[in-house]
A protein has these predicted regions:
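A structural boundary/capping signal
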Residues: 1-187
């Protein structure tokens, strides 16, 4: 990891070495293509630390963001880690997402490896422009799940601090949803 000097090098390293999946409490690695990937997630998921992620070569966006956090902070960047979800009073199947943004010169950059459809470093002139762009990407994805108009108003975006290692999916979601809500222009 010490030989990775730039965000671009980090993205290349991660895209070549980290697969989308997660480590279960039972020690099993769940790959995205596994038949029980989604059904076991809430019951089995634990947040990996960076060493485990490197050894297992699997992590979801939660795990990958913590790996990214470690690298960016070690290399002196100003960062924020952001979470988005549809927060309803009932269980729902809508996907959530965590991602990292960082300041580079006069730009805000969205660093994305876990979401292979949006993989890359996306540069924006303002923080608000970045948040609005990502919100619309998330909304576009949610429409594939036939999200209802009234549920769209329940999308929250939070900025969160580093969670504890090895917490469950439930504990992670509690941590990030109880973090600071970011208000921004979603148009």
């Amino acid at each position: 990891m010490n030989d990775i000097k730039t965000p671009e090098e980090l993205l290349t390293f991660m895209s070549q070495n980290i697969n989308y999946g997660y480590l279960g409490k039972n020690g099993k690695i769940y790959h995205y293509a596994d038949f029980d990937f989604n059904t076991k997630w809430y019951e089995q998921y634990i947040l990996e630390n960076s060493e485990e992620l490197l050894n297992n070569k699997y992590g979801n966006c939660f795990d990958q963001v913590e790996f990214e956090r470690e690298w960016f902070l070690k290399n002196g960047y100003k960062i924020e880690t952001i979470y988005e979800m549809v927060k309803l009073e009932y269980n729902n199947e809508y996907p959530t997402h965590a991602f990292l943004v960082y300041k580079d010169d006069n730009y805000w950059c969205w660093f994305e490896n876990a979401d292979s459809n949006n993989r890359g470093i996306h540069r924006f002139t303002t923080y608000e422009e970045l948040l609005s762009y990502q919100y619309h990407k998330y909304l576009e994805y949610l429409k594939k799940y036939n999200i209802k108009a009234e549920e769209i108003t329940k999308i929250i975006t939070t900025v969160f601090e580093k969670p504890k290692e090895h917490i469950s999916a439930e504990e992670y979601i509690e941590h990030v949803t109880n973090s600071k809500i970011i208000n921004f222009n979603k148009k």
